Swiss-Prot record:
The active site is at residues 235, 264, 296. CDD domains: LDH_like_2. It catalyses: (R)-lactate + NAD(+) = pyruvate + NADH + H(+). This is Putative D-lactate dehydrogenase. InterPro entries: D-isomer_2_OHA_DH_cat_dom (IPR006139), D-isomer_DH_CS (IPR029753), D-isomer_DH_NAD-bd (IPR006140), NAD(P)-bd_dom_sf (IPR036291). One of its GO terms (molecular function) is NAD binding. Belongs to the D-isomer specific 2-hydroxyacid dehydrogenase family. It is an enzyme of class 1 (oxidoreductase). The lineage of its organism: Eukaryota, Amoebozoa, Evosea, Eumycetozoa, Dictyostelia. It comes from Dictyostelium discoideum. Disulfide bonds: none annotated. One of its GO terms (cellular component) is phagocytic vesicle. NAD(+) binds at residues 153-154, 174, 206-207, 233-235, 259. The gene is ldhA.
Length: 340
């Protein structure tokens, strides 16, 4: 059976080849999945796509016409997938729901600590033989109040490290409380406004939907403490970049760490060295000394990529044997039958 894997990189080839104990034929395509490249999957029973691949109505209809029966997302997010079209055409969309909450929560912590102690700037200085520490002042981690927005697996892990590891005060917000979080003495607040008003460091760990889009905007920033640090390792559009820039310029936001960006599709996972960044907000944010932007790599650990590749292959096995795990299925296809 054939799988076409879009947005292929050497690390995907390495791990899928190592874990493909089922001897599936895998067609590796370096291009992202979109209307221009979709015909590369012609004759493939499955396509395996990544977070920024474009699975629009037109793309999914073309996949269906070309014989694709199932979409395997090798990530947790699926906001670029037209689920309505997949449902109508009977195409299941399977994902990897929890490949490594530790990897992402640890990365969020690394952004907090780097922005606090300015280790990235210190490293650059020393490389230039500048051993001055002027402007490198930070704060003791225990001295600040941390607000965790979203306490699923990732948010819970960050709560644990901040509370139990550093002994810091942590408050949380989520529409559903996580008992594991309250069991370690962390209090939930009833509204986001309480997070905005009470916290020195705010870390976002929520999915992107109509309620969460631009949750960090001019109105919410105005309610925050002066000098707030904001961390986003979830979805780029949780933060309105234009409003964040205004907050950074005014000093309301002291530092911003983002592993995601709303318009990242045109840039992340690609080498644009020597090119002009045409996204004005992204170009401006990259230039700020108190902003750290990385290219959606919080998930990227050996353990996580092994889990992602293994689960993606197992999802195809489960589809072919009519034993799809409900926890991995993100849509409600009318009908779906594997090729016999």
């Amino acid at each position: 059976m054939k799988i076409t894997l879009f947005s292929s990189k050497p690390y995907w080839v390495k791990w899928f080849n190592e874990l493909n104990k089922f001897s599936y034929e895998i067609n590796y395509v370096t291009s992202a999945c979109d209307i221009k490249s979709v015909n590369e999957a012609k004759g493939s029973e499955a396509v395996c796509c990544f977070v920024n691949d474009d699975l629009s109505k037109e793309v999914i209809e073309t996949l269906h016409s070309n014989g694709t029966k199932v979409i395997l997302m090798r990530c947790a997010g699926f906001n670029k997938v037209d689920l309505d079209t997949a449902n109508k055409l009977g195409i299941p969309v399977l994902r990897v729901p929890a490949y490594s909450p530790n990897a992402v929560s640890e990365y969020a912590l690394s952004l907090i600590m780097a922005l606090n102690r300015k280790t990235h700037k210190a490293h650059d200085r020393v490389r230039d033989a500048n051993f001055e520490i002027n402007g490198m002042e930070g704060f003791n981690m225990v001295s600040k109040v941390y607000g965790i927005v979203g306490t699923g697996n990732i948010g819970e892990q960050l709560c644990r490290v901040l509370k139990l590891g550093f002994g810091a005060k942590v408050i949380a917000y989520d529409i559903i409380e996580n008992k594991a979080v309250t069991d370690i003495g962390i209090e939930y607040v009833k509204t986001l406004d309480e997070i905005w008003k009470q916290c020195d460091v705010i870390s976002l760990h929520t999915p992107l939907n109509s309620q969460t889009k631009y949750m960090v905007n001019s109105e919410s920033i105005e309610k925050m403490r002066d000098g707030v640090m904001i961390i986003n390792v979830s979805r780029g559009a949780l933060v309105n970049a234009s409003d964040a820039i205004v907050g950074l310029k005014s000093g309301k936001i002291s530092s911003l760490g983002m592993d995601v960006y709303e318009n990242e599709t045109d840039y992340f996972y690609q080498d644009h060295n020597g090119s002009i960044i045409k996204d004005d907000n992204l170009s401006l944010l990259i230039s700020y000394p108190n902003v750290m932007i990385t290219s959606h790599q919080a998930w990227y650990t050996k353990e996580a990529i092994s889990c992602i590749c293994g689960t993606s292959l197992q999802n195809f096995v489960d589809f072919r044997s009519n034993q799809i795990k409900k926890s991995n299925l993100v849509n409600n296809p009318i009908s779906s039958q594997p090729t016999q």
